[in-house]
Amino acid sequence: MKIAVEGCMHGELDKVYDTLRELEKAEGVKIDLLLCCGDFQAVRNENDLQCLNVKPRFREMKSFWKYYSGQAVAPYPTIFIGGNHEASNYLWELYYGGWAAPNIYFLGFAGVVKFGNIRIGGLSGIYKQQHYHLGHYERPPYNENTIRSVYHVRHYDVLKLMHVKEPLDIFMSHDWPLGITEYGNWQKLIREKRFFEEEVNKRTLGSEPAARLLNKLKPPYWFSAHLHCKFPAVIQHGEGGPTTKFLALDKCLPRRGFLQVIDIPSGPGPHEIQYDEEWLAITRKFNNVFSLTRMPFTMLDEQVDTQDDLQWVRNKLNARGAKPIDFVQTAASYDPSCQASNPSITVHCRNPQTESFLQLLNLPYLLDSSNSYGVSRNESSSQTGQALDSDDIELPDDEDDPADDDD
């Protein structure tokens, strides 16, 4: 199976798909799957643009709306995770994962799926210590603080991934695991990106939770993006233990290392995206401690037995199959023929995919403000939040600088 992996998409679906078509023709190969490591920018319309953490003058519609509306169809099954430049309102609709557009699947804030017999896991967002132990308290409409914190990685999602026991083939994170530069040519990295030198030397470049997941999951492949450069590394997990091939990729620009194709042995098929029964069992077990306020998330016993839930899920999937629930549009698509109008206030929309997914697992819907576990929309939009640090400086997307390490 040939899998293409792309770094930061930044809404350039047309360009990436065109590049893959050209590669297929030039190399005489067939691409079976595309993976994207974040900053996908699934922007459907002007309202979604307001939920994208990019300065207004740099906000662009790009090309995702074509695939959402049906004007274009993704030529390859596509799986993506979230980064720190996303239409966060739309991804929150699909917190557990789901079709963002036909043939384009969001892995969720954390998730595992199967493609054929290949297991693919991922963690969306970037790590910021000040929000890591909080619940998912942010709701649209976002203010200047919650538009930044909504995509910050949470302990709750990492803990779920730490309970994955069956081997994964591929894992994706947006930011790099902490300390990964020690396993590659870090000297070359800082020659090309001088502004990383201090963080590399102090061993502060990257995500500590991602490093813990790397040491726990030990997947053969780990892909990241975020820092707009290509960086390979090989991690040996103990003497005689398994190895992980790590690769960070750039954003979609000419003469940049934004794309890599790997060949993984696989079964005969069908090569389609399917639910992963172990991940569904973990999701079912952890949903009753899903924190949706600013209160810190804590668990007295971090080792949770999911065997009963796993058997329950197996019985359920044996009855209905493992194919995900079909794509459903929940908002009007951008229309370039219409004059731009003032965006309306964005509020949470219950996505029928998510509702059906929760019904499948016999779980309550907790993502909006109409339940006692969450916070009201007014509360979330008026939170003053924590003071911004130096990483909160927004840089234009085309500068060759740590633009994506802004918050």
From Swiss-Prot:
A divalent metal cation 2 binds at D39, N84, H174, H226. It comes from the Eukaryota. One of its GO terms (molecular function) is metal ion binding. GO terms for biological process: embryo development ending in seed dormancy; mRNA splicing, via spliceosome. Residues 124-154 are annotated as: Lariat recognition loop. Residues 389-407 have a biased composition (Acidic residues). GO terms for cellular component: nucleus. It is found in: Nucleus. Cleaves the 2'-5' phosphodiester linkage at the branch point of lariat intron pre-mRNAs after splicing and converts them into linear molecules that are subsequently degraded. It thereby facilitates ribonucleotide turnover. It may also participate in retrovirus replication via an RNA lariat intermediate in cDNA synthesis. Belongs to the lariat debranching enzyme family. This is Lariat debranching enzyme. It comes from Oryza sativa subsp. japonica.
